[in-house]
Amino acid sequence: VSGHRVYLAGPPFAEEYRRRASALVLAAGWEPLDPMRRDFRGNTEGHEAEIVLGDLADIDSCAAVLADFTRPDEGTSMEAWYAHSQGIPVVAYTGGQWAHPWTVYVSASVHNVLEDAVAALAAALGGVPA
């Protein structure tokens, strides 16, 4: 597991989150891993296993998960649960939205502001230097 890779979990069409999160994670000295680099939007039928197994492998290769919980998304929830079940810390970003009990349970910390969530990655990563 790389000590410096952060998986960017979030809804498929959350381009602004992915852009901002990638920039903030890079600025902190870590490598963002965006699963949407394998873009199956509008073409998921017949590719379900490839999508899920690719996402799971990506999560396994990361030291932490930054999860966009600003709106409900099944994939984000499943990715966060999987990471949590594997002992990979999850930091949740809610954008001020209510945090579901499951979000709180699987997350090392929950933040309304994306910058605060990225700052919290250092604690989630056990002080891995930026």
Positions of predicted regions on the chain:
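Conserved catalytic or regulatory cores that recognize and/or transform ribose-phosphate-containing ligands
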Residues: 1-130
